[in-house]
């Protein structure tokens, strides 16, 4: 029935493309008119569009003419005309959708269309790439087109001077990585001067390789951290414990005796669990090595930290392995990105895990980090007014894009028909048999002159295969994190006849593999040679292109690029990315995955079923099974993993939304403090509230005089705020004085002391001092609050055992923590401002200058293990509504946190 309806009215994708094609026809009809314009007239169109937009013409109405202008500029600047399918993709991106375009279809050029159109609004467009190389390359390459049309471009990269960053963000179009955009947002919310902030309001972003950034990286929060307490000695001593504990042969089963051993490893959840016997063994070992006093338990409150350090050491020994999850380089443990195979220099696992791995490897242990600010990519990118993305593989994750980001996926047709042959998987019993078959396939391709790209899942596997190829005397290139610097060069040459390239996962995304090899690199070198005249350069380039044509033809005759996968990935999408490197722009190509029952995916999720099939068929050694049923079984396993990972990301988002709402409130109020001409009225309100709260602690409302602790109040006022008031004498002289009148006198005394300080140093200098003290207090307490939320999240799943909903408990307790933090900020600010002793304006200015200094050193970007918060958390919950922008909340409206209080009595206390 559904298929019949689709035939009659078309799928949603078909209907969208039909609508877009009408606009493409409109754009094409403008081509003769736009082509007739001179370069100056074409460039002047930008200002004309801006004027029309300011006068009320919408960007949607400007689209046909603006796209026609960009197409013409592309012809004049690059000698490249946007295809109609690129126009379709550009329209999808402008409409805030994800455009799925196959590899080699020209996504970079396509993006110029919506980028130019949205830059007309003058609010800044961000183009987000996966690495700094692509950001710089695309900014320089596409920047030529934008400059031709009178628009400015900027690029943001790590370690860039602040003034350059500010200029880059002020440009019409800004290129950068997802990490750098996110970090700059966090840095902006840690600045002490308005002029040091970098970003404008987040208006429109186009995310390149959107699946990699919004799906693969979704569980990786950006964290700015600073050094915390030193536990180096503890990590070294704890590292000796895991080898003394015995691993169980299997996981304990309910209602069965526990297998012999101290702990078991759950590879699916990446966790280690202790048995009852294991706890006893651990206590004996820790007592023996002097970490636990004789007769005391690991579960005593003062030894809980020991338990944490031991579990971290166990995870480091059983779940994290050299040349798989990390490499050791220059006496440092460097994380390897599980999705791209790249080294993630500067990133560190948090919660003590990185230090435990360093202790295991015997390298220098670096200090633990305290979180200063953090945000997930999910929440950062949802802050843009409009978001869109492009990739070659989004369709398998279309549901998640819609559910989490409310982004619809539009599949853009290819410019030329796809002719790549995707062959069935071959499954072998052992890894050795699998690699022998891969070697035979590579040798056959090499002898026939067919280029081969071999995809591996880890650096370890890529180097194992490279060793086998060396033994077989087959020349090859290895592209993994260790050869990152040569990435573009290796990928550019990967299409030459008989070339063999081994790549981890999707290293090299963003650079096309051209059949016959890429001539662009050599053309660039010729252009850079100043010793040659223009005529000589043209002649050499012509010769180069002539030599390339027979190479291109030879590779096509050999079957195009051959893709070999050495393992299936957990996600079908990453398999499709590997396959997508072949068959670009209608080129021939083929692909096949070789698997063994010893591969992690097969072992954990599909091994038993496929092994049973192989045993029934009684296949001889070295003989693979190749059948649609096996491939379907593997895809079912992948769907299970994808579904589980989606549930984890969705649950993480539900937890992080709590912190995100608090972050928005706090950052909004911090920005108000930073931008306000004076915060005197805010400070006065905080001071009066703090005085009243202290007063009511000693003299409760509606209480009789016998219940008043006047002496205690006098002492507290003098000790905490240096307010010397003879309250006892006042009451003796005026017996009829009410508590309200007494409160007014205390408030008036506080105000008088404060006014004297202001007059002593001058209103202007004092206003700046107030601002710096307020900002310092907000930052300090926010850091502590983030640590408190981390601890709360790690143990919250245990509430499930008490028949409570962990998410609801987390929301409730996080709100209580946030309310407590606001109270502490208020008390802290009032105490400092009331008790500070200043002699001159110069002292105040010096204090302000000290506060404005960079107060975060060694900014690091590292993983945080959020899986613990999700453990045992039951079924996935329904999706929460997605809000792109937090609306401005009126002071008397209900607080958006859901407490039921008015905003002014809740999170608006600092506003």
UniProtKB/Swiss-Prot annotation:
Zn(2+) binds at residues 895, 897, 906-907. Transmembrane segments: none annotated. It comes from the Bacteria. Its cofactor is Zn(2+). GO terms for biological process: intracellular protein transmembrane transport; protein import; protein targeting; protein transport by the Sec complex. InterPro entries: Helicase_ATP-bd, Helicase_C-like, P-loop_NTPase, SEC_C_motif, SecA, SecA_CS, SecA_DEAD, SecA_motor_DEAD. GO terms for cellular component: cell envelope Sec protein transport complex; cytosol; plasma membrane. Pfam families: P-loop_SecA, SEC-C, SecA_DEAD, SecA_PP_bind, SecA_SW. Keywords: ATP-binding, Cell inner membrane, Cell membrane, Cytoplasm, Membrane, Metal-binding, Nucleotide-binding, Protein transport, Translocase, Translocation, Transport, Zinc. One of its GO terms (molecular function) is metal ion binding. Signal peptide: none annotated. Its EC number is 7.4.2.8. It catalyses: ATP + H2O + cellular proteinSide 1 = ADP + phosphate + cellular proteinSide 2. ATP binds at residues 86, 104-108, 512. May bind 1 zinc ion per subunit. The keyword Repeat does not apply. It is a peripheral membrane protein. Part of the Sec protein translocase complex. Interacts with the SecYEG preprotein conducting channel. Has a central role in coupling the hydrolysis of ATP to the transfer of proteins into and across the cell membrane, serving both as a receptor for the preprotein-SecB complex and as an ATP-driven molecular motor driving the stepwise translocation of polypeptide chains across the membrane. Belongs to the SecA family. Monomer and homodimer. Part of the essential Sec protein translocation apparatus which comprises SecA, SecYEG and auxiliary proteins SecDF-YajC and YidC. This is Protein translocase subunit SecA.
């Amino acid at each position: 029935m559904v298929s019949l309806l689709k035939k009659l009215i078309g799928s949603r994708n078909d209907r969208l493309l039909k609508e877009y094609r009408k606009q493409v026809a409109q754009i094409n009809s403008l081509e003769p008119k736009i082509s007739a314009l001179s370069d100056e007239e074409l460039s002047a169109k930008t200002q004309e569009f801006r004027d029309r937009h300011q006068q009320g013409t919408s960007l949607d109405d400007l689209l046909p003419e603006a796209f026609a202008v960009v197409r013409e500029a592309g012809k004049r600047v690059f000698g490249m005309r946007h295809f109609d399918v690129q126009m379709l993709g550009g329209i999808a991106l402008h409409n805030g959708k994800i455009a799925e375009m196959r590899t080699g279809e020209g996504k970079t050029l396509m993006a110029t269309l919506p980028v130019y159109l949205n830059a007309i609004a003058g609010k800044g467009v961000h183009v987000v790439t996966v690495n700094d190389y692509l950001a710089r390359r695309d900014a320089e390459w596409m920047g030529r087109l934008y400059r031709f049309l009178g628009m400015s471009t900027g690029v943001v990269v790590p370690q860039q001077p602040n003034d350059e960053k500010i200029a880059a963000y002020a440009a019409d179009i800004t290129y950068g990585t997802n990490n750098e955009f996110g970090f700059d947002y966090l840095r902006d919310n840690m600045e002490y001067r308005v002029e040091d902030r970098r970003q404008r309001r987040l208006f429109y972003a186009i995310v390149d390789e959107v699946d990699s950034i919004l799906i693969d990286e979704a569980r990786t929060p950006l964290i700015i951290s600073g050094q915390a307490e030193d536990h180096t000695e503890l990590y070294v001593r704890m590292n000796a414990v895991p080898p003394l504990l015995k691993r169980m042969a299997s996981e304990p089963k309910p209602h069965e005796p526990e297998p012999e051993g101290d702990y078991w490893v759950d590879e699916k959840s990446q966790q280690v669990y202790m048995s009852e016997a294991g706890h006893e063994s651990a206590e004996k070992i820790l007592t023996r090595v002097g970490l636990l006093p004789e007769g005391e338990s690991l579960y005593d409150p003062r030894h809980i930290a020991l338990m944490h350090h031991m579990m971290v050491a166990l995870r480091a020994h059983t779940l994290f392995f050299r040349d798989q999850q990390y490499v050791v380089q220059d006496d440092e443990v460097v994380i390897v990105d599980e999705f791209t195979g790249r080294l993630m220099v500067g990133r560190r696992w948090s919660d003590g895990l990185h230090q435990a791995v360093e202790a295991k490897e015997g390298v220098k242990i670096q200090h633990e980090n305290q979180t200063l600010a953090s945000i997930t990519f999910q929440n950062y990118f949802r802050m843009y007014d409009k978001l869109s993305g492009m990739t070659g593989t989004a369709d398998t994750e279309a549901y998640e894009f819609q559910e989490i980001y409310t982004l619809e996926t539009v599949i853009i047709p290819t410019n030329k028909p796809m002719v790549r042959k995707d062959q069935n998987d071959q499954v072998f019993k052992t890894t050795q048999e699998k690699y022998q078959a891969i070697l035979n396939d590579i040798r056959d391709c090499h002898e026939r002159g067919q280029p081969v790209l071999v995809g591996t899942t880890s650096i370890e596997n890529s180097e194992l295969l490279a060793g086998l190829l060396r033994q077989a005397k087959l020349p090859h290139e290895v592209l993994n994190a260790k050869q990152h610097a040569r990435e573009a060069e290796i990928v550019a040459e990967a299409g030459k006849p008989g070339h063999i390239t081994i790549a981890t996962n999707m290293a090299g995304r963003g650079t096309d593999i051209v059949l016959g090899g890429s001539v662009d690199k050599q053309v660039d070198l010729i252009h850079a040679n100043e010793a040659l005249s223009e005529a000589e350069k043209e002649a050499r380039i012509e010769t180069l292109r002539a030599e390339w044509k027979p190479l291109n033809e030879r590779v096509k005759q050999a079957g195009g690029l051959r893709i070999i996968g050495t393992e299936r990935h957990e996600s079908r999408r990453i398999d499709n990315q590997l396959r997508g490197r072949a068959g670009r722009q209608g080129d021939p190509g083929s692909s096949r995955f070789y698997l063994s029952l010893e591969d992690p995916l097969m072992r954990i999720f599909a091994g038993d079923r496929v092994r049973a099939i192989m045993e029934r068929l009684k296949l001889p050694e070295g003989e693979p099974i190749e059948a649609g049923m096996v491939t379907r079984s593997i895809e079912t396993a992948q769907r299970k993993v994808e579904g589980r990972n989606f549930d984890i990301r969705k649950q993480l988002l539900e937890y992080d939304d709590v912190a995100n709402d608090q972050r928005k409130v706090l950052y909004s109020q911090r920005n108000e403090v930073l931008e306000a001409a004076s915060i005197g009225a805010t400070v006065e309100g905080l001071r009066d509230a703090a005085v009243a709260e202290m007063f009511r602690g000693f003299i409760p409302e509606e209480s009789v005089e016998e219940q008043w602790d006047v002496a205690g109040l006098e002492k507290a006022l003098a000790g905490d705020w240096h307010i010397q008031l003879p309250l006892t004498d006042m009451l003796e002289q005026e017996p009829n004085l009410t508590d309200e009148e007494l409160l007014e006198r205390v408030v008036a005394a506080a105000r008088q002391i404060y006014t004297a300080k202001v007059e002593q140093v001058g209103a202007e200098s004092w206003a700046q001092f107030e601002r710096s003290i307020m900002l310092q207090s907000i930052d300090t307490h926010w850091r502590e609050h983030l640590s408190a939320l981390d601890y709360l999240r790690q143990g919250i799943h245990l509430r499930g055992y008490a028949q409570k909903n962990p998410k609801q408990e987390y929301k409730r307790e996080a709100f209580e923590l946030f309310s407590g933090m606001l109270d502490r900020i208020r008390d802290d600010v009032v105490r400092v401002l009331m008790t500070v002793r200043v002699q001159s304006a110069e002292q105040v200015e010096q204090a302000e200058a000290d506060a404005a200094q960079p107060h975060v050193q060694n900014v690091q970007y590292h993983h945080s293990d959020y899986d613990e918060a999700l453990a045992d958390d039951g079924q996935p919950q329904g999706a929460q509504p997605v809000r792109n922008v937090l609306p401005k909340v009126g002071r008397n409206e209900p607080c958006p946190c859901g407490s039921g209080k008015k905003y002014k009595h809740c999170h608006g206390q600092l506003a």
